[in-house]
Each structure stands twice: as C-alpha cells, then as structure tokens.
Amino acid sequence: MNFAKELKEGTKKSHSAAENTAFVKSFLRGVISKESYRTLVSDLYFVYSALEEDFRIFKNDPVLGALYLPELERVTALETDLRYYYGPIWRSIVKPSEACQRYVDRIHEVAGTEPELLIGHHYTRYLGDLSGGQILKGIAQKALNLKDEGLCFYEFGKIDNAKIYKEKYRSILDKLPLTDSQQNAIITEANYAFRLNMYMFDTLEGNSLTSFCKIIMGFIRSKLT
C-alpha cells in the first residue's frame, strides 16, 4: 500500500470522529452563528500561521521541501476574512482560544523536534480544505447570509481543478523518502491533529474540558500501541 493510501486508511476513524462533533454537525446543517464562525476563522488563522511559518523554514529540506506548496497557503485569505468580520483593527482584537493555542504549540513542538511530523498536520488541514471547501463555503454563505465577503478561506485561486490537484498531492506523499517508522509516526501525528481539531470545535460548543481529556488519553493510547 502506498503512503497516501496508508495515511487515509490510518486516519479514517479520526476523520469520521472530527466530522461528527456537535459543532461540525451543526455547521453542516447550516446552524451556526456569526460569532461562532468568526471565532473559528480566528483560530484557523493562528493554526495556519504556525503551520505555514514552520514549512517555510523547511522549504529546502529534502523531505519537507516537496510539500512546500505556496498555492495552498491560507493565511492571506484568512486575514482578508478577519478584516471583514472584525474590522481594520482585527489584529488587536483576535486571540487564539486555549484549544487553538495547544494546536499551535504542538505544530511548533514537532517542527523543533521531529519536523517530518509536520506532514501529518499538512495533510490533515490542506487535503480537507480542498475536499470539502466548496460545500462548506456554500453552507456558510447561506447560514450567515453572506454575499461575496468573509469566505476567502475556501477559495484557492491558484488551483484550477481540486480533484487533479489532490491526485498530485497524493503522488508527492508517495514519493517522499520516508522510512516505515517515520510513516507510522506521521500517521499517529495526523490522528493527533484530527483530535486537536476536534478540541477546537468542541471549545466552540463549550465542551472543551471533556474533549481535551479524551484527546490526551487517545494520544497516550496511540503511543502505547
């Protein structure tokens, strides 16, 4: 089995769990407040800022450099959305939630210790954005009564065909010079990334403590198996 397929199979349960959080299910039904949504946009800004900052450091790395793909970057789009939701002084207003900060800290931690694990975070975030972005854009637009503003996050102006691009992305994953041990560690990290996303979503629903305990216990169990 190639690495892209192993990564997909190895994160299937976590992916499904993330899609079934109360926040995501409400979002998919079009039940979301503007306040919750702009808080999500704010948290995503900090997550992507960390991920993209760290990937730039490794853009010439023999492994990570292959996934330095500026056309995927979301920070500029999120900045535009935050300006819409919070106004021109948004930088002095927004701050990461506790759940978001844990996510950001984890990204920086692996960048400094085992940088190849960043691949798990890269995969979890960007492939998901490409896969469901247009559907989520339509839901958010209708639920929040938006026109053309506040939705830049879902727009990939430099990617003409998401389906073809995802195949290219998977091909890059398959060609990465990784050992079996590194691949397994990346799959474990990708599962943890999904859990960190779930913690962020649950925080928006007010279930942060229970969610965080589940995340930590799940991560510990994954390390013991």
What are these regions (language model features)?
Residues 1-225:
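Metal- and O2-centered redox machinery and metal/ROS homeostasis
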